[in-house]
Structure formats: structure tokens, C-alpha cells
UniProtKB/Swiss-Prot annotation:
This is 3-dehydroquinate dehydratase. Belongs to the type-II 3-dehydroquinase family. HAMAP family: AroQ (MF_00169). Pathway: Metabolic intermediate biosynthesis; chorismate biosynthesis; chorismate from D-erythrose 4-phosphate and phosphoenolpyruvate: step 3/7. GO terms for molecular function: 3-dehydroquinate dehydratase activity.
Length: 163
């Protein structure tokens, strides 16, 4: 399955998300980036998808990942650009340029925080934005992306059926 790019989704995490579990746990919780990646891989697998998870503190690396997704023909992108969501026109332009279905994710509710976090450039390039659900937002994002791209799951393992 990993050889089929049309079954692959990229899960891209931006700056400081490597510090999950220790950075501001009152805001971001105690789950680590490894926990997030495990959740994404497990959720994607339920839909017959392969989640390829990456994290970078560097804007250009994230832009390169978006470009690579187009070249490889991946099915979709889950993006938590962290603070770059609020500042990066480069990420916005990259997402607009590749035309790959994208869901923006934020662990915290960015609209209930500082005013500078209320605006997201990357959200304008995504078909959906999910915030405030903790790391469960990644599961919700993959579920929504799977529906958007027509990936299906067996009802015995369907995470939405278990809710």
C-alpha cells in the first residue's frame, strides 16, 4: 500500500510541535508528537490509507514537503503549521499551487487565544479547518479527508461508527 501514492496522505507538523508533551501542557496537553503520529497512522490505516508523518521547525522544509506531495501524487495533506499558520504566505501559496485536498489542524482553539492567532493564512488554502479538539483533531481531520477523497472503511473498524 505504501507504494501507491494515491493511498498516501502527508501529515505535516510545523514549528515547536516536536515539543508536544512538555511545551505548555495546559494548552496542548500531555500527548507527544509520537502519540500524534501513532494516532494518525492508526486512523489512516482504518481507511486503507498510509499516513506519512513529518515535522519541521523550518518554513521552507514544510513548503518543500507540500511540493513533494504534488510530485508524488499523494491523496491529501493534514497540516498543523503551528505559528506558521498565522504568518506564512509561502505555505498558503504552496497549498494553493498544488491543489491537493488539505485539512488544517490545531490542537488548541486558536480563536479562543491571543488575537494574533485568530487569522490563518493556511486555512484559506484548506477545504476544512479543525481546532480545539486536542490531538483528537488529527483523527477528525483524517476522517474528513478520507470522506473527501472517497476512501472507505469497513464498518467493523469505522471510527465514526464507534462514537
Amino acid at each position: 500500500m505504501a507504494d501507491d501514492p494515491h493511498k498516501t496522505i502527508y501529515v505535516l507538523n510545523g514549528p515547536n510541535l516536536n515539543l508536544l508533551g512538555t511545551r505548555e501542557p495546559e494548552t496542548y496537553g500531555h500527548a507527544t508528537l509520537a502519540d500524534v503520529e501513532r494516532l494518525c497512522v492508526e486512523t489512516a490505516t482504518r481507511f486503507g490509507l498510509v499516513a506519512e508523518c513529518r515535522q519541521s521547525n523550518h518554513e521552507g522544509v514544510l513548503v518543500d514537503c507540500v511540493h513533494e506531495a504534488r510530485v508524488k501524487g499523494v491523496a491529501g495533506i493534514i497540516l498543523n503549521a503551528g505559528a506558521y499558520s498565522h504568518t506564512s504566505i509561502a505555505l498558503h501559496d504552496a497549498l494553493m499551487g498544488v491543489k491537493i485536498p488539505t485539512v488544517e489542524v490545531h490542537i488548541s482553539n486558536i480563536h479562543a487565544r491571543e488575537s494574533f492567532r485568530h487569522h490563518s493564512f493556511t486555512a484559506k488554502a484548506a477545504f476544512a479547518s479543525i481546532c480545539g479538539f486536542g490531538i483528537d483533531g488529527y483523527r477528525l481531520a483524517i476522517t474528513g479527508l478520507a470522506a473527501k477523497i472517497g476512501a472507505t472503511t469497513d464498518t467493523k473498524t469505522d471510527i465514526t461508527a464507534q462514537a
